[in-house]
Regions:
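Extracytoplasmic/periplasmic domains immediately adjacent to an N-terminal transmembrane anchor
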Residues: 1-191, 363, 395
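Hydrophobic alpha-helical transmembrane segments
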Residues: 3-5, 134-148, 186-198, 219-232, ...
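Residues that define the loop-to-transmembrane-helix transition and helix capping
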Residues: 27-28, 239, 305
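Junction motif at the cytosolic side of a transmembrane helix
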Residues: 6, 17, 213-229, 370-395
Length: 395
């Protein structure tokens, strides 16, 4: 009995060593598994480190040339979010500036603005935004809304019968409110999107590295290395091989995950409310699900380079399907079911709750359960695919 256990552990170590040696010797695999996870999170975090956009350039078309229009432009330019970069004589001139990407939006003040206000009629200020940059669009529209609300309040005070500041404040703002940011205290885009992106980077780099690894083996005609061939003569050979390979990748990505999920947020001062013990309990099923998922996809892809196309065309879609950048309640049921095939869906949801909302492991039982189910299903699939490949004598 002891000899069998010793032989089992020896075979696992042999598979572990063979996999580690293959990863280090293959430049493409080493690049995506060891180098890319070090620098890619830094690049993304650095891009979004400013959190919010400031001084977005805007073109103003003032057809009114009145005191009210000048007041609107002055208050609008005073906003920290936007900057009046150009004054244009027509909408067409402003549109050419947008086409050249010199400005991100247009504010049009109509000719009858002052006349309508003096007649106590409703006037319209038109705002045109470049929708290709959502943060710039938000800054332009929010600043215009704030200025128009403030000027509306001033007009109400001027027309109201009140005589004191207290009466005027009740007239313009009868219901006061206080906005409290519960989790994303900065209100920035980095704290909002980066936790999901970091979890997706772990899955996609694992998929890239494993896909290249198994793609090379398929091109060479075997999935079993020469050093592990003797294992095939023993009982449950595929289990021994898969276990060794899994432990190798788990060891590598344990270090990668600690760097990506713990070091990167601290380096760029992102919100981090997680508890280390809960993170370990959550990351274990996520890594196992990602490893077995990558093995399964890697053995299904016919050529080595095909995995790069898969990752490129799925990364943005998987981020949307995770429910972080778009509410899950607004995603069609078919796509919600499709998203359940990927570990990143539950990994991102669980990590956002742990990291940004300060949840405990007991609060993400559903995500953990789904990740364990995925790990089991993809483990069995990878085991069956490897057994089928060996049965067809690819080695």
């Amino acid at each position: 009995m002891f000899d069998k256990i010793k032989q089992f552990l020896s075979d696992i170590f042999c598979s572990f060593y063979s996999e580690a040696r293959t990863i280090v010797r293959d430049e493409g695999v080493a690049l995506f598994m060891l180098i890319v996870p070090l620098f890619y999170p830094i690049l993304y975090s650095w891009i979004y480190n400013n959190e919010v956009v400031r001084e977005v350039p805007v073109a103003v078309v003032d057809a009114s040339h009145s005191a009210q229009s000048r007041e609107f432009v002055r208050r609008y330019d005073a906003s920290p979010d936007v900057k009046v970069a150009y004054f244009c004589n027509s909408i067409e001139e402003a549109r050419r500036l947008v086409a050249k990407q010199e400005v991100n939006g247009i504010v049009y003040l109509p000719e009858d603005l002052s006349k309508r206000l003096n007649r106590m009629e409703s006037a319209t200020v038109s705002v045109y935004c470049d929708m290709s940059l959502m943060l710039a669009y938000k800054a332009i529209l929010t600043a215009a809304t704030s200025v128009s609300s403030l000027m509306n309040a001033n007009l109400q005070v001027a027309l109201a019968p009140g005589y004191t500041d207290h009466e005027n404040s009740i007239t313009t703002q009868p219901l006061n409110y206080e906005e409290v940011a519960m989790f994303n205290s900065t209100g920035g885009y980095g704290n909002f999107i980066l936790p999901g992106v970091l979890m997706l980077i772990i899955q996609q780099t694992l998929l890239l590295g494993t896909g290249l690894l198994y793609g090379s083996r398929r091109e060479r005609g075997f999935f079993i290395t020469t050093s592990t061939l003797p294992i095939l003569k023993r009982r449950l050979p595929m289990l021994r091989i898969i276990t060794g390979r899994t432990l190798c990748m788990l060891l590598i990505y344990a270090a990668v995950t600690a760097y990506v999920l713990l070091a990167i947020p601290k380096m760029f001062h992102f919100v981090q409310l997680l508890h280390p013990a809960d993170l370990v309990l959550f990351v274990l099923p996520y890594l196992l699900a990602c490893i077995f998922f990558a093995m399964t996809i890697g053995m299904l892809i016919p050529q080595r380079e095909d995995v790069m196309l898969v990752v490129v065309f799925t990364s943005v879609g998987l981020l949307f399907l995770s429910g972080v950048s778009w509410p899950q309640s607004n995603i069609p049921s078919f796509w919600r079911a499709f998203a359940c095939l990927f570990p990143s869906t539950f990994g991102i949801q669980g990590f956002v709750k742990l990291n940004t909302m300060g949840a405990l492991i007991s609060d993400i039982v559903y995500e953990c359960r789904m990740l364990w189910i995925q790990a089991l299903v993809y483990f069995l699939l990878a085991l069956w695919l490897l057994h089928r490949a060996c049965k067809k004598k690819y080695y």
